[in-house]
């Protein structure tokens, strides 16, 4: 039996995780960090850092899906990963992972000049704008455009009702429009990813992991 503590259980993602875990016989959501095997965190940066300290005290692996960290907070997380297995990801869906791989493949073969727009849409309650995933996509493009064929990258953010998450990356010039898009039709895709990672991270050594370490 895998015992999971969820930080942010009363939120949208916490409720989704609770719902998905209820369908799995060998996983239990518990209320005590001291007695859990792994922690999943979907909360706010300040709450994440508090739970991080408790994980450090108890040597418990931590899966963080919270967004909106500043650079100082990210440095604290990085330092903590020297002592416990830790994953920080702004999007744990396998679909977004596939989207990122497709963009990397496109950039590795591209020989044309393009401009780029990243358009992201989320629900109105989402605090950070642009989304962490949109920022990650921008960084992926910057890091994989080895020959500087992408002249500009702009992020457009939109907040509307009843949207789980849409990310669209458009490369365009006066001849072509190349579009990569992922839309989350259910919040459960993020929950399933977080649960799968939680099951695996308990076997890992202390380090700062990414989704790539689990979905390859």
Question: For the regions a protein language model found, what residue spans apply to each?
Answer:
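Conserved strand-to-helix beginnings and helix N-cap segments that scaffold or border functional pockets
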Residues: 52, 74, 99-100, 130-134, ...
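Rossmann-fold dinucleotide-binding core
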Residues: 84-131
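C-terminal substrate-binding/catalytic lobe of Rossmann-fold NAD(P)-dependent oxidoreductases
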Residues: 3-7, 12-36, 112-216
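Hydrophobic beta-strand scaffold residues
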Residues: 29, 62-63, 86-88
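Rossmann-fold NAD(P)-binding glycine/threonine-rich loop
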Residues: 46, 53, 66-87, 94-99, ...
């Amino acid at each position: 039996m895998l015992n999971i503590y969820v930080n942010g259980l009363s939120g949208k993602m916490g409720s989704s995780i609770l719902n998905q875990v209820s369908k799995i016989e060998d996983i239990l959501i518990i209320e005590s960090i001291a007695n859990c095997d792994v922690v999943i965190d979907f909360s706010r940066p300040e709450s994440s850092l508090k739970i991080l300290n408790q994980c450090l005290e108890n040597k418990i692996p931590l899966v963080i899906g919270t967004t909106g960290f500043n650079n100082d907070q990210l440095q604290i997380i990085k330092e903590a990963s020297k002592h416990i297995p830790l994953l920080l990801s702004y999007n744990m869906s396998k679909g977004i992972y596939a989207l990122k791989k497709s963009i990397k493949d496109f950039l590795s073969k591209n020989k044309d000049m393009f401009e780029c727009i990243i358009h992201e849409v989320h629900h109105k309650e989402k605090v950070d704008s642009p989304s962490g995933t949109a920022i990650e996509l921008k960084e992926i493009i910057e890091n994989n455009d080895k020959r500087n064929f992408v002249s500009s990258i702009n992020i457009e953010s939109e907040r509307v009702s009843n949207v789980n998450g849409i990310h669209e990356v458009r490369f365009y010039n006066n001849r072509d429009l190349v579009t990569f898009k992922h839309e989350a039709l259910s919040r459960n895709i993020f929950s399933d990813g977080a649960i799968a990672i939680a099951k695996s991270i308990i076997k890992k050594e202390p380090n700062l992991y990414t989704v790539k370490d689990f979905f390859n």
